[in-house]
A protein has these predicted regions:
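Alpha-helix capping and helix-loop boundary segments enriched in small/acidic/polar residues
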Residues: 6-13, 33, 101, 139, ...
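A glycine-rich phosphate-binding loop feature that marks nucleotide/adenosyl-phosphate handling sites
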Residues: 41, 61-65, 81-86, 130-131, ...
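Function-dense linear segments that define catalytic or interfacial modules
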Residues: 246, 252, 261-276, 280, ...
Length: 838
């Protein structure tokens, strides 16, 4: 027997649905009825239904009402009637909205919204009222859908935050209809045909269809779960459709969100030797469930012809004209493909230094940094956004005072570089003096003078050896000095930090002390977002020769590649993961580590220097987002010992899972080239971090025997963009506010703390209201488990004194924190890095 639904659809009749409806009617009145009595009433209802067709939902419900009344269950029957009236009212609202918009298919979307969201808080009648206020005569159906979506966005409030999910569903409905129409016009059906079309148009990398058969693409299409689109907030879906999915050259999106995730998975699993389609599925699942986000370049560029997947690069600028211009050229090429850059200027001679023996000839680092600044502005990624670069200088460099005023608004504009991000590399000695005696002298020197007089580069040392050589240089009268007090430098640093958010801080001794690959090199600085700490070395010019090749005269320049650092990033979305479930967490970390390792081999490198270093070290940076989201969901206050203990446990588990996954990869695919002699191999990595339990000792032995696939594993990026995609909080930062409205390009976007509710409200304390000493302590706790660094911001208000800000820097140094990113003053707007938005 069949039954006709209210939509007109005819489906098989299921009598158990009647039984369930009657049970709900009784339980709604707090009444329990014997199953035998219910079965008897059901039997009466069934006997009264027509057997010769024409059965409808309305007829069934009418008979249920009559039977309830006849059996004396008047209150239940009354409630049942009222329930039917309520459902009828809901149907009228959604049908009316669909009719006003002129889109019959919209009714199904609205029906699901009514099913998934509480009617008392999210009534479609409120959406209809708001929508009608936006409607104008002669609006097209698409314009009406935009107005309906805008209405849902504007209904988002602290009391009703889930309207942003409803707005996302409406946006997705509009996009899906438009996208389906585009492909129908092109006569394209199915995923394989779509990929063939995109490949032929030069929008998809031809390597995907070259490596996967049609059968495999068809299998992958079966992995797609369109229902996961409901995980998006409006802000996340809007961002994804505008920036991440493949677009035509006229900027129309041609990929669904799920097709984007699957395309990334196909790319990342491409080289898997066995079980490749299983890895495609695992990569797709972790991305589409929003449990892991890849960095913005990976999300944007995987599956495309120019698949530059890395976020940031770091170069050591040599002290030569050729070397400086080579570094600037390297930055331009990196920026062209969307990468951010960190440049270490600590080797470049200071203002007034000698050139070829001519005293006072050198112009110093500022003029070169201005050249970098202009390159960042000029190479703007097809007009999308200008390049991004952090410039690092040592705390003892002679040009430091001018460097610390690069972005401030006062002073000589010819000495400014407003589009770069300055950062200072501090030795322990500086903080020791700042702690004990701010009036202590601090001697600034030129690296070229030191190299000329002493025969060594002071910046090539760290820790006690650096301090011994620094004091030796201070006492050598042949080396010119610019002597100031520690207080003078601190004052310049803090003034700039409060005014501009920079300079970033890099604690070079803490970094090198915990470097697992200190046997192979030195870390001079970090990257654009201060989360990367890997061995560095400048590119060296070897020779320039004139040759004859095929009858032509050619000039050949040979260089030694140095160590040009590359950052391959992804983030665990802690707010979306069951972090207490060891098995689930380990499987997720294993999948993410494997995906990142594959990035190294599948990447399109803008420079050969980058490719060589990346294959030599195979460094990755697995980080986290949703940190505050995770705490709030569990009822953990930011300013509490419970927070510190929980963070310690979670990050130890993440680190354990990452190392375990990495050594298993080494057994399967081989170690990185410099494993022998590393802290991984000697066990010093585990000793330095106090990992002494039985399971850690066992893991250390396994690592020593099997090796490590990747030289560096963990690094916490800011995730400013990808955290919006996954509907969680950014990186390890507290939320800025529980709720606020952001204006972007003429529209108002609601920003809501993830899963904001009465349960989480009090655990979402705003960033600027938090005692920052708790943030510093938490960073110190996490740092023990992170082999690289963290993009950690400090949030200050206008009430902070300079001494209080200095105290935070000192607390961070004492806690072993390696880097500090922005000082975010409440009155200051700072730019977020899009490259490291993993």
């Amino acid at each position: 027997m069949n039954i006709r639904k209210r939509t007109g659809e005819v489906v098989p009749f299921q009598e158990e649905k009647i039984l369930n409806a009657m049970k709900k009617a009784f339980s709604g009145q707090a009444q329990e009825l014997d199953d035998r009595v219910l079965d008897e009433m059901l039997s009466v209802v069934l006997k009264r239904l027509p057997e010769n067709g024409g059965l409808t939902v309305e007829r069934v419900q009418d008979e249920v009402e009559r039977v309830l009344m006849e059996c004396g269950h008047y209150e239940v029957a009354k409630a049942y009637i009222l329930y039917r009236e309520k459902r009828a009212a809901l149907r009228r609202v959604r049908a009316g909205l669909a009719r006003e918009v002129g889109d019959d298919a919209l009714e199904d979307v609205l029906r699901q919204i009514q099913k998934d969201f509480e009617e008392e808080v999210y009534p479609l009648s409120a959406l209809q009222l708001k929508f009608e206020s936006f409607c104008k005569p002669a609006m097209t159906m698409e314009a009406k859908m935009e107005a309906l979506t805008k209405a849902a966005v504007e209904l988002t409030t602290v009391e009703a935050p889930k309207w942003e999910f409803i707005a996302a569903r409406l946006l997705n409905h509009t996009f899906s209809k438009r996208n389906a129409s585009r492909w129908t016009e092109r006569g394209v059906k199915g995923l394989y045909e779509k990929l063939r079309y995109l490949t032929d148009k030069g929008l998809y990398g031809d390597y995907i269809l070259a490596r996967y058969s049609r059968e495999e693409i068809d299998t992958a299409e079966g992995f797609l779960c369109p229902e996961r689109d409901t995980l998006f907030t409006y802000s996340g879906l809007d961002l994804l459709l505008k920036r991440y999915v493949i677009q035509s050259r006229s900027r129309e999106p041609l990929e669904t969100p799920q097709e984007m995730f699957l395309g990334i998975a196909l790319h990342l699993a491409m080289n898997e030797a066995s079980g490749r389609m299983d890895w495609v599925r695992r990569f797709y699942d972790m991305l589409s469930r929003m449990e892991v986000t890849m960095a913005t370049p990976t999300m944007s560029n995987a599956r495309k012809p120019h698949h530059q997947l890395s976020s940031c690069f770091i170069d050591t600028v040599p002290d030569s004209l050729d070397g400086i211009y080579r570094s600037v050229d390297n930055f331009a090429k990196v920026s062209k493909f969307g990468g951010g850059m960190g440049l270490y200027f600590g080797k470049v001679r200071a203002t007034g230094s000698a050139i070829r023996g001519f005293q006072g000839a050198a112009g110093g680092v500022i003029r070169w940094i201005r050249l970098v600044n202009d390159t960042a502005v000029a190479v703007d990624q097809l007009g999308m956004r200008q390049g991004a670069v952090a410039v690092y200088l040592d705390a003892w460099h002679k040009d430091l005072p001018e460097f610390l005023q690069l972005r401030t608004n006062n002073g000589d504009d010819r000495m400014k570089a407003h589009d770069v991000f300055p950062a200072v590399c501090y030795p322990d000695l500086f903080w020791k003096l700042a702690e004990k005696n701010l009036d202590a002298p601090w001697h600034l020197m030129c690296p070229h003078d030191i190299l000329t007089v002493k025969g060594y580069a002071l910046e090539d040392y760290w820790g006690e050896e650096w301090e011994k050589r620094y004091l030796d240089c201070v006492s050598d009268p042949r080396i010119g000095k610019r002597t100031v007090t520690v207080k003078d430098i601190v004052r310049l640093v803090l003034r700039s930090a409060v005014e501009t958010g920079t300079p970033f801080a890099f604690n070079r001794d803490a970094v090198n002390r915990m470097n697992p690959n200190g046997h192979a090199g030195m870390i001079y600085c970090s990257n654009l977002c201060t989360e990367i700490a890997q061995n560095m070395a400048p590119i060296e010019h070897i020779s320039t020769e004139v040759r004859t090749e095929n009858g032509d005269t050619v000039v050949v320049t040979a260089t030694r590649p140095g160590e040009f650092v590359v950052c391959n990033l992804a983030s665990l979305s802690l707010g979306n993961l069951p972090v207490e479930d060891d098995a689930y967490l380990e499987r997720t970390v294993e999948t993410a580590v494997r995906a990142l390792d594959n990035v190294i081999d599948l990447n399109f490198y803008p420079l050969e220097y980058a490719r060589l270093t990346n294959h030599k070290y195979r460094s990755i940076g697995l980080g986290v987002s949703g940190y505050h989201h995770m705490l709030a969901k569990r009822g953990i206050r930011w300013e509490s010992e419970e927070h510190l203990a929980f963070a310690d446990a979670v990050f130890e588990r993440i680190n354990y899972a990452a190392i375990r996954a990495d050594t298993a990869l080494a057994r399967e695919k081989g170690c990185y080239a410099l494993f022998e002699g590393s802290d991984w191999q000697t066990g010093a990595y585990f000793e330095k971090r106090g990992y002494a339990s039985g399971k850690w000792r066992e893991l250390a032995e396994t690592v020593a025997a099997q090796g490590m696939r990747n030289a560096y594993l963990l690094a916490i990026a800011p995730t400013s963009s990808t955290s919006i995609l996954s509907g969680t909080s950014a990186g390890i930062d507290p939320v800025m506010r529980r709720f606020f409205l952001e204006e972007k390009k003429g529209s108002i976007l609601p920003r809501v703390a993830p899963e904001l509710s009465l349960d989480t409200w009090w655990y979402y304390k705003a960033a600027h209201l938090i005692d920052q000493s708790w943030s510093v302590r938490a960073a110190g706790v996490r740092q023990r488990h992170i082999d690289q660094a963290q993009s950690m911001n400090l949030y200050i208000t206008n009430d902070y004194t300079m001494r209080q800000v200095l105290a935070l820097y000192l607390d961070a140094w004492r806690s072993g924190v390696k880097t500090i990113y922005y000082i975010r003053s409440k009155s200051l707007e700072v730019e977020d890095c899009e490259s490291c938005a993993s």
